[in-house]
């Protein structure tokens, strides 16, 4: 069982977002949230909210409560969104471009399957 949450048009560059999500990729949900709590980056709050949203989506879709320790981040991805372009006045009547980048964040949470124990022969 799995569920996803998507957050779009986040006002942060994808590179800054990827620096954070690379540290929590392929971890359990409580471990990822604990790591995010102690990181100083501004985007950690957005990443944590999106992870929690995916967990709640899983509980809502399957009408049952899951132990958060059994949930794992199956996929977490930061894609580039639209770029807002502005101009800043420069010397001699010129203009320099300002690119305000945005990010689309996708989180997929799945129930970690336990390996079946082999029967002793």
Swiss-Prot record:
Molecular function in Gene Ontology: rRNA binding; structural constituent of ribosome
Superkingdom, taxonomy of origin: Bacteria
PROSITE patterns (UniProt xref): RIBOSOMAL_L22
Keyword Phosphoprotein: no
GO BP term (any one): translation
Function: This protein binds specifically to 23S rRNA; its binding is stimulated by other ribosomal proteins, e.g. L4, L17, and L20. It is important during the early stages of 50S assembly. It makes multiple contacts with different domains of the 23S rRNA in the assembled 50S subunit and ribosome.
Membership in a protein family: Belongs to the universal ribosomal protein uL22 family.
NCBIfam families hit by this protein: rplV_bact
Protein name per Swiss-Prot or TrEMBL: Large ribosomal subunit protein uL22
Source species taxonomy: Bacteria, Pseudomonadati, Rhodothermota, Rhodothermia, Rhodothermales
Gene name in the database record: rplV
